[in-house]
């Protein structure tokens, strides 16, 4: 049980992450869980209920003990790093909103991550997936939703969270999808006709009325579709057709990039289409025109027809 003043700070921090930093709900929930774990450990470490003063005066020994505890509890290096990033983020917020200055936590480096290469699917596996994903859903509109969503991800390289945020407003531009990705960075991706046509067909039979700003991909109860629900459909597909274990919604984003590269697209254009943080929107379109991006996309992409 947290002190009410601490909980109030956490609530303000969460609002800040959503409204000011444009963090996704998934990231905010993960960060909140990491901070909660840290504060629970602090409570155990100090043998008393955590106060604001405990948080402000946490020393390097406490923080390293918490990281060691996570390691002993078999958290992955990635999870430990994310946890430390979450807590640092909270302390950075405290610096902005309280009298806290230059906390010791910022001197602690994240553990080195093992770099894993992203796993793409073969083009044959992608074709099998796109041809058979409609077999799952039990209701026609759900089956068409699954296919439209999967084609959209593979045809545009969107993150699953980005794809699930598509609204009717995105469909009004006949040529491009304008996406606000991580860190509020904007990128523009050419619409592939097959993706847009499937989405249009899906919306024609969707049994729920939606406003222009509402996400178009819905669950069976009419609420916004969540990533785990869609990935469960992919698990069924994967098991039935003997597809690779690493097949997930995100693997189609990796496949988008890999297949473009294999078909002659240059790395820089692919990075721009993916919206990687190393390239800002301004850099994207001062150095490479939208016309060039479209040309690269339409000449190199394997399912353009």
From Swiss-Prot:
Disulfide partners? none
Q: Which UniProt keywords apply?
A: Cell cycle, Cell division, Chromosome partition, Cytoplasm, DNA integration, DNA recombination, DNA-binding
Core-binding (CB) domain residues: 4-95
- Give the Gene Ontology MF terms in alphabetical order: DNA binding; tyrosine-based site-specific recombinase activity
Cellular compartment(s): Cytoplasm
Protein's name according to its UniProt entry: Tyrosine recombinase XerC
Write out the similarity annotation.
Answer: Belongs to the 'phage' integrase family. XerC subfamily.
- Coiled coil start-end: none
What is the annotated role of this protein in its UniProt record?
Site-specific tyrosine recombinase, which acts by catalyzing the cutting and rejoining of the recombining DNA molecules. The XerC-XerD complex is essential to convert dimers of the bacterial chromosome into monomers to permit their segregation at cell division. It also contributes to the segregational stability of plasmids.
**Is Membrane found in the keyword set?**
no
Gene expressing this chain: xerC
How does this protein assemble? Forms a cyclic heterotetrameric complex composed of two molecules of XerC and two molecules of XerD.
| Superkingdom of the organism of origin | Bacteria
Give me the segments passing through the membrane: none
Give yes or no: UniProt keyword Cell division.
yes
Q: Which residues form the Tyr recombinase domain?
A: 116-298
GO cellular component annotations, sorted alphabetically?
cytoplasm
From the UniProt record, give one GO term of the biological process aspect. chromosome segregation
Q: Where, by residue number, is the active site?
A: 159, 182, 250, 253, 276, 285 (o-(3'-phospho-dna)-tyrosine intermediate)
